[in-house]
Amino acid sequence: MRFFFVFLAIVLFQGIHGAYVEIGYSLRNITFDGLDTDDYNPKFNIPTGLAVDPEGYRLFIAIPRRKPKVPYTVAELNMVMNPGFPVERAPSFEKFKKFNGEGKKDLVNVYQPVIDDCRRLWVLDIGKVEYTGGDADQYPKGKPTLIAYDLKKDHTPEIHRFEIPDDLYSSQVEFGGFAVDVVNTKGDCTESFVYLTNFKDNSLIVYDETQKKAWKFTDKTFEADKESTFSYSGEEQMKYKVGLFGIALGDRDEMGHRPACYIAGSSTKVYSVNTKELKTENGQLNPQLHGDRGKYTDAIALAYDPEHKVLYFAESDSRQVSCWNVNMELKPDNTDVIFSSARFTFGTDILVDSKGMLWIMANGHPPVEDQEKIWKMRFVNRKIRIMKVDTERVFKYSRCNPNYKPPKEIEV
């Protein structure tokens, strides 16, 4: 029997600098059609990452198994059948439709899906659930594994799998975001590198798909330089401190190298390193500090818009999304807020899809140590939000556009 996610979706429009951010889906909890809610707890189904394939009209979310009875760790939505607006009915997520093939394993625990320039969907399956008891024994235990699926082919077959060696990480559950670097998009897509962040080890793991080999780098710039705050229920606050978390790739040069921009989750600084250095095992890194975005701008996720040369940041506690043009000096005066809402509770992921659409997601679930306290929180508004806006609209009316001219002030 095929089960479906069922949740209430609403559409709102938020005006920011003349642009509009569409709230396509907002959820209090995710439930599953065909399953009695007595058999599982819907509040444990918290998505942490998303990926969008506009060519195939598919949206993917990752739901890690941090609590028992999470039916699917990767799910998808048909955006033709469920565009998000107008609200005619509740859209239905499905289990990720893939063909494993003989001997292939199902996914155990995924935090982040990523689609590369060759329309391959990548996930890092960390290899174990994050609890004991309950249904934990029904899931196999293994190493963190990178897996790729071909979105261009029927049934989305698995086409690549690589286990991360034990000596490259200290814990399976502290991986952050990752990026896939296809060196030559007009050639063989297997000439690719994957850059995996680890916010506990403050390390960056590099996987060479051609050689099927991985290595890691550590650097002081990967470390947290402050303590982050998550504000909840008025004056109540929670603290957390995490290192390297978000990574985004800039424009390629003639040799196929590009800047890899990165942020620690507990920092407001932005750094980059040339991927030429990352592609060499035991190479020397020469990080570049671009600047500081200013107080209260901590973020765990960022995304690059190649059309407009802009980085976007899903901020963690400010409940807003900001931008910075990479051709400008990085300082607060050269950044801008393109979205702000009290209902945007903890930005967890952000991306620019292949059609130039900016997607952002909040889930109300920061990486604090006292996770049990998070699970017990009550939200007045729907905490899970997936929104989108055309980057052209955002760019045109923000300071991230070098030609932007603010409206004249009216003298009174």
From Swiss-Prot:
Residues bearing carbohydrate: N29
Tissue expression notes: Salivary gland.
Localisation: Secreted
Record bears the keyword Amino-acid biosynthesis: no
Pfam family, one: MRJP
Keyword Cell division: no
GO cellular component terms given for this protein: extracellular region
UniProt-listed Gene3D superfamilies: TolB, C-terminal domain (2.120.10.30)
Keywords of the record: Glycoprotein, Secreted, Signal
Leader sequence residues: 1-18
Highest taxon listed in the record's lineage: Eukaryota
Function, as annotated: Probably modulates blood feeding of sand flies on vertebrate species by binding and sequestering different mediators involved in the host response. Binds biogenic amines. Binds serotonin with high affinity. Binds noradrenaline but not adrenaline. Binds dopamine and octopamine. Binds histamine. Inhibits host smooth muscle contraction induced by histamine in bioassay with guinea pig ileum. Immunogenic; elicits antibody production in the host. Functions as a chemoattractant for host neutrophils; likely acts through a G-protein-coupled receptor and effect is dependent on calcium influx.
UniProt similarity note: Belongs to the major royal jelly protein family.
PANTHER family found in the cross-reference section: GH10609P-RELATED, PROTEIN YELLOW-RELATED
Name of this protein: Yellow-related salivary protein LJM17
Organism the protein comes from: Lutzomyia longipalpis
